[in-house]
Design a protein with these regions (language model features):
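N-terminal amphipathic alpha-helix/helix-capping segment at the start of soluble metabolic enzymes
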Residues: 1-5, 150-160
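Hydrophobic faces of well-ordered beta-strands that scaffold small-molecule active sites
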Residues: 4-8, 40-42, 72-75, 102-106, ...
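Generic structural signal for well-ordered alpha-helices
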Residues: 25-30, 57-61, 88-92, 132-139, ...
Length: 171
């Protein structure tokens, strides 16, 4: 059987609200689990009134708590928007609560306009070229903690959180 996954943006239907959109996402994840889907992904989008998945790790916690077997992942977290340590702590927490079920997809674009990026308080002068170093830093936080390690993700160190590089191709 070909493994199938769901990518959900948690759309807010006209006349509805974000809370209902997130409840609908949980219903969709439960259906995907019952149908034997392999993974359920949510994507990070900011400042978009029609999408409720901006706080992706929080939304994934809701989905993971309401399902039992399906893998849950970010498809993806836009790495330029976040410090690698914070991502490691968030997804380390998810992995500690739901062992063997958490995936982390990373994107290299900010995925938002400059006004929104500024509101997220990230360095607007950071280069996309920082992506490889940020990925390596993030992966380091998931390695087993070594004596004398100055900074650790707790939870995070030594946990199995597969990291995926997301992207798109132009045809």
């Amino acid at each position: 059987m070909i493994p199938l996954s769901v990518l959900d943006l948690s759309p807010v239907a006209e006349g509805s609200d974000a809370g209902q959109a997130l409840r609908n996402s949980l219903d969709l994840a439960r259906l995907a689990e019952r149908l034997g889907y392999t993974r359920y992904w949510m994507a990070e989008h900011h400042n978009m009134p029609g999408i409720a998945s901006a706080a992706t790790a929080v939304a994934l916690a809701h989905i993971a708590a309401g399902t039992a077997r399906i893998r849950i992942g970010a498809g993806g977290i836009m790495l330029p928007n976040h410090a690698p340590l914070l991502i490691a702590e968030q997804f380390g927490t998810l992995a500690a609560l739901h062992p063997g079920r958490i995936d982390l997809g990373l994107g290299r674009a900010p995925g938002s306009d400059q006004v929104t990026a500024r509101a997220m308080r990230r360095n607007l002068h950071a280069e996309i070229d920082d992506f490889p170093q940020d990925v390596m830093e993030l992966m380091g936080y998931f390695r087993p903690v070594v004596p004398g390690q100055a900074v650790q993700a707790v939870p995070g160190g030594g946990l199995d959180v597969p990291i995926w590089k997301i992207g798109r191709a132009h045809v």
